[in-house]
Design a protein with these regions (language model features):
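Short, polar N-cap/turn motifs at the start of nucleic acid-interacting alpha helices
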Residues: 30-36, 119-139
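Active-site/catalytic core of tyrosine-dependent DNA strand-transfer enzymes
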Residues: 54-98
Length: 168
């Protein structure tokens, strides 16, 4: 499937599932990998604990390298935000999304879904935002990018994951 590599699609999926920034996702060490993961956010220094869906956890465990969950081709390094960004942009263009789409869009997808299910205050807590106005920008970002386009992007990412699983 053109657009995204499997590891980058998996990183985007983990960001969608947890609301974690892509930099935090990519810097996960294999030793941190469990169904309920705790990270210290690079940007804020705050702790975030999330339960990862079991099927996603299994795919992450399969994907993980010796040191990093998302290893780079360069020894001892993890994948970069820039590599994921390029893949996300390619996938967005495939579905005709010309608005700004980046790995951070995964965090917004998380916010939209979480706010619909649990309300703005819960989403603010989940994203570790100090200001609810910032959370509102994330949670209502689907009014800026239409749902059907976000669903198409999510579909492309799901296809990549399914293709990879089918080839095993």
């Amino acid at each position: 499937m053109q657009g995204m590599s499997y590891p980058n699609a998996l990183a985007f999926e983990l960001s969608c599932a947890t609301g974690w920034r892509i930099g935090d996702v990519l810097s996960l060490r294999t030793s941190q990998l469990c169904e309920e993961m705790t990270i210290t956010e690079q940007k804020t220094g705050k702790t975030s604990k999330k339960r990862v869906p079991y099927a996603l956890f299994c795919r992450l465990r399969e994907q993980a390298g010796e040191e990093w969950v998302f290893p780079s081709r360069r020894a001892g390094k993890h994948r970069t935000r820039q590599a994921v960004w390029a893949d996300v942009r390619r996938a967005a263009r495939l579905v005709g999304l010309e608005t700004h789409v980046s790995p951070h869009t995964a965090r917004k997808i998380f916010a939209v879904e979480d706010c619909r299910k649990n309300g703005l205050a819960h989403t603010q807590h989940e994203l570790n935002h100090r200001d609810s106005a910032v959370t509102a920008l994330y949670a209502f970002s689907d009014t800026i990018i239409p749902d059907y386009k976000l669903n198409e992007l999510a579909g492309i990412i799901a296809e990549i994951v399914i293709d990879k699983l089918a080839k095993k």
